């Protein structure tokens, strides 16, 4: 039996009910072929409560598979590590993930990691930063301008296109300045 285990990014560690999900289907972790942690919990841990933890929008494998559902910066670049929380399909996925976990009898509560937008510096799991970014550049690069985010921002009276143009201008000014 394997003694050392390396987690598989973007997978779930329980048997998902695929019917709960929409276009984003959870990826089942291969460790489930050997051991179902959630199913076997009551058998081995009779007096211990189980608190589940799940990652919501920080999911590079899902982002690679669904780049149209990712956060986009002011330049239109997708952040494949961050599914856009304003997208209806992403919201459906997160709700289904929580519902699926909550349906497991041994689960007492669920802790959600990254239920929303990520800061730019959190980023990809193996990012390299060759250009030192000041706080303002990092904050501006973290803003999402996906079609879904812009549509929802506009519905709240935000001038999303003007804001996006301003952000692009500020970032271009930063990158052209040579101050980094």
What are these regions (language model features)?
Residues 55-105, 130-132, 139-151:
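Active-site-adjacent "subsite" loops/lids of carbohydrate-active enzymes
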């Amino acid at each position: 039996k394997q003694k050392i285990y390396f987690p598989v990014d973007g997978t779930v560690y329980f048997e998902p009910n695929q019917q709960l999900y929409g276009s984003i289907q959870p990826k089942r972790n291969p460790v489930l072929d050997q051991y179902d942690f959630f199913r076997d919990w009551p058998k081995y841990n009779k007096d211990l409560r189980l608190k589940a933890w799940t990652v919501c929008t920080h999911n590079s494998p899902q982002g690679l598979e669904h780049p149209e559902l990712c956060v986009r910066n002011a330049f239109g670049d997708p952040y494949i590590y961050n599914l856009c929380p304003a997208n209806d399909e992403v919201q459906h996925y997160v709700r289904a993930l929580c519902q699926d976990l909550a349906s497991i009898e041994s689960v007492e509560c669920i802790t959600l990691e990254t239920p929303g937008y990520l800061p730019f510096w959190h980023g990809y799991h193996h990012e390299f930063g060759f250009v030192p970014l000041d706080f303002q550049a990092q904050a501006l690069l973290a803003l999402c301008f996906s079609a879904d985010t812009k549509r929802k921002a506009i519905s709240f009276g935000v001038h999303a296109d003007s804001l996006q143009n301003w952000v692009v201008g500020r970032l271009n000014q930063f990158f052209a300045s040579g101050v980094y």
